Amino acid sequence: MINYEVFVGNTSYTALIKQEIQQLTLCMNHQGVSAGNLVAIAIHEPISWLVAYYACKELEAVPVVIGKVAELDKQLEIVRADYVCYTSDHYKIQIESLSVVKERNIPSNTGLICRTSGSTVGMPKYVAWSKEGITYQKQETTRVFGYKEGERLLFTLPLWGAYGLSIVGVLEHNSMDLVIPANLRPRSIITVLEKQNVCWVESAPFFYQTMLPYLFKEQRGIEEIGVKGWGCGGDLLTHTFVQQWVEMTGVPILDGYGLTEAGPNVSLNRPYDYCYGTVGKPLSGTEINFSEDRELWVRSPSVMLGYYANGQVDASMLHNGWLSTGDMATRDEHGYVTILGRKKNIIIVNGYNVSPEYVERTIREHPGIRDVAVVGVPHPTRGNRLCAFVVGDASLTKRDIDLFIKDKVDEPSRPSFYEIIPHLPVLPNGKTDRNQLKAIAEVRFGQESLV
């Protein structure tokens, strides 16, 4: 049974959740759900998701966390679960038996199966986490942050993503309370932080990029609220932005790094040991290494058992327990890790390899820019040209940005096109949806790139 309080805004849902867990557990038991069965949870609304998740745990079934998907039937074909939980009208949870799976081979220590973020135009993969890895993540993350029983944590992202699942693990390990914001309006967030005595906040860059302008506008310092740590997953915030945040709140934003395949946390900044512009130091027990092209490799107790599909767990991509992350990174002499960008995101411009994350970090230092994403627009002879989608002040012009970065990056790294937009599209885990932006750029600038 769930061992912590749950609030939406200032309203407690704990009693309702516990009651519905009991009811769903009885219903699942009546349907024949038993230990080791795979139960797909195709729910995105947080309260109903918690009910289904903990009902699975009561019966020692293995949750297969699908979350919000457009084509559920296709996902069910991939995961080959024994049962599926979903919500009908008015968030009523349904449990349905699926066709009998005759052939399935998954390790006996599988504790959970979750999916990678995918994108709006890409199919996600499913990852099997071990019971031991889940326990390791709970214990090590608790050790890093010093969480205490009864403290309250505000979380703004989906619980069914890898980030959310790690938060749920920490909450149950420490009997901490979960606060889900009723909305993301800055004034409402501050009210909830005050009334709920929130100690920890976990979110993504878009949350902080919304909050900081409000704090400046209202000239509102929030040191007195008492938040111990502001965590950030997804993409990195700039050094300048974090400094401005500290000026207004008195507490740094703690960037970290993880990926679903690693269980998820790999490296974290600590409240007592952090370095701006980095993702902190690896967890104790987590090993990291670098290939010749600076790709980051990880080995830890929580690295996935393998990718799961069609009743099988495939661990062929692991090499003696080492996971290729696909991210380029460095580690300095003090042990802090810096993520340079995704290897697969590299854009070839006139024969040069350009990291869009490097260009983005440079552009973000402009005082009038809140966020940016850079993608490639195909060109028949030059490989690609760069297009920067910029979120910034209304007075911002393309010439302003060009002049700002002219002497800061080499010529291949300078965008040919700029598009000023109100906000960047994001995936459920808070990361920028680059596939969507690339599709927009090709439609908007594809013909222009031919000249």
In which residue ranges do the predicted regions lie?
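Conserved AMP-binding A3 loop
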Residues: Y13-L16, G111-Q139, N269
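Conserved AMP-binding/adenylate-forming
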Residues: C27-A70, F155-P158, N353
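Flexible, low-complexity linker/hinge segments
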Residues: D89-G111, K138
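Conserved AMP-binding/adenylation subdomain of ANL enzymes
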Residues: T135-R152, W160-W200, T210, Y214
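Gly/Ser/Thr-rich phosphate-binding loop
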Residues: V198-S203, L212-Y274, E287
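AMP-binding/adenylate-forming catalytic core of the ANL superfamily
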Residues: V201, R294, S300, G306, ...
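Conserved ATP/PPi-binding loop(s) of AMP-dependent carboxylate-activating enzymes
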Residues: T278-G285, S291-N320, Y352-V354, L396
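AMP-binding/adenylate-forming catalytic domain of the ANL superfamily
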Residues: V409-T432
